[in-house]
Curated annotation (Swiss-Prot):
GO biological process per UniProt: double-strand break repair via homologous recombination
Protein species of origin: Kluyveromyces lactis (strain ATCC 8585 / CBS 2359 / DSM 70799 / NBRC 1267 / NRRL Y-1140 / WM37) (Yeast)
Organism phylogeny: Eukaryota, Fungi, Dikarya, Ascomycota, Saccharomycotina
Function: Catalytic subunit of the SLX1-SLX4 structure-specific endonuclease that resolves DNA secondary structures generated during DNA repair and recombination. Has endonuclease activity towards branched DNA substrates, introducing single-strand cuts in duplex DNA close to junctions with ss-DNA.
Principal subcellular localisation of the protein: nucleus
Protein name listed in UniProt: Structure-specific endonuclease subunit SLX1
Length: 288
């Protein structure tokens, strides 16, 4: 049996494609690299891409939105499968289903309604998933919320450039790829910068948990406990991950918290992000 520590992926998303020449054609997938995956679907990369996106007359595709923040690859694949099979997935209650038959054709409003239903399920809800839009019509459909599914508005993001987009039809796929690339690269740069700050904090000197006062020494102790940080640039809070977990759940009935406030600066922090950086940092420092 492997003793390998679970690591939250740097990035993994479940995405919705829409055919530009055939706007009633959609495709749902998942990937750790949406830029490369979109290029595969559009034939710019020879290997990869799904059979359904290769059908005559459907290319090029644009990625109208993706959902990200999954705490594991398995969770992202489960979301993808549930989104593709919304008519039967266990993650949507029977009395809430928008689609009840396999071959029912449904438009953007139904696709996004199903995304809302999945995001509100307790299993995915605890991950604090975000949905990012790269298409104005898709974003407007989300905002309209045709099926009145009450979830996700606070975690909705939209690429502001698409709100004033007047691009020609033959430019849409290239601009869509550029916007997704810009967001993905910015996201990865932010992740790298934050991780480097945490790493510097741990390796420059011996630290102590600011809750239990236990010494935290990543310099000499390879088996040291995982650590939780505050993401605020002006806050130097750190603690044992287990101590922060107890702090976040002491007045809650939730086994896994969604969020909590930094004991030092009181900023609201997403638990899934704290765990993510804790696992990545531990793996990186042990390897180094």
């Amino acid at each position: 049996m492997s003793n390998k520590q679970h690591r939250v992926p740097d990035f993994y998303c479940s995405y919705l494609l829409r055919s530009i020449p055939k706007p009633n054609s959609f495709y749902i997938g998942s990937s750790p690299d949406p830029v490369r995956r979109l290029r595969q679907h559009n034939g710019a990369v020879r290997r990869g891409g799904a059979y359904r996106t290769k059908r005559n007359g459907t290319r090029p595709w644009k990625m109208v939105c993706f959902i990200y923040g999954f705490t594991s690859k398995i969770a992202a694949l489960q979301f993808e499968h549930a989104w593709q099979h919304s008519y039967k997935t266990r993650f949507i209650e029977n009395n809430e289903r928008l689609v009840t038959k396999k071959n029912t054709r449904n438009g953007i409003a139904t696709k996004l309604g199903n995304a809302r239903l999945l995001m509100k399920h307790p299993y995915f809800d605890k991950m604090n998933l975000h949905i990012r839009f790269f298409d104005r019509l898709a974003w407007e459909s989300w905002e309209l919320n045709k099926f009145k599914v009450d979830y996700g508005l606070s975690l909705c993001e939209v690429d502001e450039a698409v709100l004033t987009d007047e691009s020609q039809l033959d430019e849409l796929d290239e601009l869509n790829l550029e916007r997704i690339k810009a967001f993905y690269e910015d996201q990865m740069a932010q992740e790298s910068s934050l991780l480097q700050r945490y790493q510097d904090n741990l390796t420059y000197d011996q630290k102590s948990c600011m809750i239990c006062d236990k010494k935290i020494d990543y310099i000499h102790d390879e088996g040291t406990q995982m650590v939780g940080f505050c993401s605020d640039d002006e806050c130097d809070f750190l603690s044992c991950l287990s101590c922060l977990y107890k702090e976040f759940t002491k007045n809650s009935k939730q086994i896994i918290p969604k969020s909590g406030h930094c004991p030092n600066c009181h900023k609201c922090l997403e638990w899934s992000q704290i765990v993510k950086y804790s696992t990545v940092l531990r793996e990186k420092l042990i390897k180094d």
